[in-house]
A protein has these predicted regions:
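N-terminal glycine-rich phosphate-binding loop for ADP-containing cofactors
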Residues: 1-210
């Protein structure tokens, strides 16, 4: 392709510095991560990385605004911004299965999001994705290790949005504390490390994950 042709990837987790490390003209390349379903979900992460031409990042942000998308500027780290929130939300949910069912966990999660983690995992066939992305994040620490159950379960037995399983108050409190703990832990880390701005993080969570 021409040296001035823009090249982007829709990867959700691999840093641009790894994807494009052998590209001759690195300045015209970056990651633009869409969220499913892309025809409906407006959020797009636009990744700023060391080799990207700032004018390219600015142009892509303008282009997405002009086409009805919402660009969210993110630094070039493992899993960027929103996958760090979503993947670890799902991973923590799986670690809760020693004390609650998938339906109970999704019911409590429904107080905060439209659909619980297990319903979304079924929809996206996301179990292998969590294994891959959290294994990748283990470069930052053992605490990101994916729950082993993701390797042995194909489909979760859960409840759809708007439906609820019976959950006793003690169990509901434990689920709530763990899920919110994951959400706040990742959010604070993202802002503290300047992976993204607090405003883009909040907007992205509402649009892409809410």
């Amino acid at each position: 392709v021409r040296p001035d042709a823009l090249i982007t990837s829709n990867t959700s987790s691999l840093p641009a510095s790894r994807l494009f490390d052998r590209l001759e003209h690195k300045g015209r390349a970056t990651v633009t991560h869409f969220f499913a379903p892309a025809f409906r979900n407006p959020a797009v992460e636009v990744i700023r990385w060391a080799e990207a031409d700032p004018e390219v990042v600015d142009y892509l942000s303008w282009l997405f605004c002009a086409t009805g998308k919402v660009p969210l500027l993110t630094e070039d780290v493992l899993c960027f911004m929103l996958d760090r929130v979503f993947d670890n939300w799902c991973n923590e949910a799986a670690y809760l299965l020693d004390r609650a069912t998938a339906g109970e966990i999704d019911t409590v999660a429904g107080d905060y999001v439209h659909a619980g983690p297990f319903f979304v995992l079924n929809l996206a066939r996301g179990n292998p994705i969590i294994v891959e992305t959290n294994t990748l994040q283990m470069e930052e620490g053992e605490h990101y290790r994916p729950a082993s159950i993701f390797r042995s379960v194909d489909t979760w037995k859960t409840v759809p949005p708007g439906k609820a399983a019976a959950v006793d108050a003690t169990t509901a409190g434990q689920i709530r504390d763990r899920l919110l703990g994951s959400l706040f832990c990742q959010s604070v880390d993202i802002v503290d490390r300047s992976i993204a701005s607090a405003s883009d993080l909040e907007l992205g969570c509402c649009l892409a994950l809410g």
